Amino acid sequence: MKERRGKTAAVKQALEHINATLGTDLVLMTDADALFESDTIANLLKWFSDPSIGCVGATPKRIGQRVEEEGHRSMFSMVRNLESKMDSTPFLEGSCMVWRAEAMDSSALHVTSNADDAQIATNVRIHGLRVIQDSSVYFIDHAPHERKEHSRQKVRRAQGLQRHLLRQKKHWFNRRHGRFAPILRQEAALHILTPLMLVGALIAMLARWASIGFAEIDFTNATLTTLHVGLFTAEMVLLASWFTVRYGLRIPLLNQVGTVIDGNLQLIRALWKSARGSSLHMWDQHQDGRN
């Protein structure tokens, strides 16, 4: 590649070369810093004895991950496994995934967007074969230690998935895809609608506090007082839960809630960058946690 155009463009060029010269049945994609267990590849390849399987991905084991990354990755993998059992998952980890070459149309890759792994996984399923994540097969990679690098990585990945899901909207209600269509709708709701709802909730919270500060609220009204106290308590619990993951405090239950909030904040940032026309499909790899 003569000039830097982003990872997806590089993946597309590599796939075109493979299809033109090698004629292989299966394609394995990984990252330069990903480590495999001794039986990772062999266990992934076993799945292809089933002709309905088009793509299989391994489950990540992260080294040095922050509290929010640990919580996010646990929930992310759980959802991938559930989707795999229902039908197929639209998202896999590009650090270790294998697919049938004939099931993937490389021309469908959008080179000005990232999430190349999700693009490949979804394309294979749309062509009729199942896409699954194997919960018992692992790869190992490094997660950023610093909050700044963690957030930068999450926002970039979030934007890629959001843009990918929006491009798939014609498949959200396509009955030909069976149970995969509801999965796409669910992921679109989680990655696009939910963060927008959080923005609405934040605006409503600020408006409520403004009304308390500038309007004459009758706190002798027991019902109104109970409502405000209840909302204040809920807001403080949610804020405290976010602080636990923001500053690496391990507190059960609060960490899980904080992980969800933190993830949606990254999704909001990704939506904002997209709204401003900022594309994150080209980036500098984080060095934090790799040395």
What spans do the regions from the language model cover?
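Catalytic donor/gating beta->alpha subdomain of glycosyltransferases that bind UDP-sugars
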Residues: F48-F76, V111-D116, I120-E187, T259-L265, ...
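Short acidic donor-binding/metal-coordinating loop in glycosyltransferase active sites
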Residues: K2-E3, T24, A32-A34, D116
